[in-house]
Structures are given as structure tokens and as C-alpha cells.
Amino acid sequence: INIKDILAKLVKVLGHV
């Protein structure tokens, strides 16, 4: 798992909110 993947996921979740 890459850090970028995690950050991208967090950004996606936060962006969804």
C-alpha cells in the first residue's frame, strides 16, 4: 500500500463530505 493511495482515499472521502 502506498502513502499516495491512502492520501488519495482520505481526500476522496473528505471531498465526498
Curated annotation (Swiss-Prot):
GO cellular component annotations of the record: extracellular region
One Pfam family of this chain: Bombolitin
Organism expressing this protein natively: Bombus pensylvanicus (American bumblebee)
Record's function text: Mast cell degranulating peptide. Its mast cell degranulation activity may be related to the activation of G-protein coupled receptors in mast cells as well as interaction with other proteins located in cell endosomal membranes in the mast cells.
Protein name (Swiss-Prot/TrEMBL): Bombolitin-4
Valine amide PTM positions: V17
Superkingdom field: Eukaryota
Main location: secreted
Tissue spec: Expressed by the venom gland.
InterPro entries, per the entry: Bombolitin
Family according to the record: Belongs to the MCD family. Bombolitin subfamily.
Location of this chain's protein in the cell: Secreted
Keywords carried by this UniProt record: Amidation, G-protein coupled receptor impairing toxin, Mast cell degranulation, Secreted, Toxin
GO molecular function: toxin activity
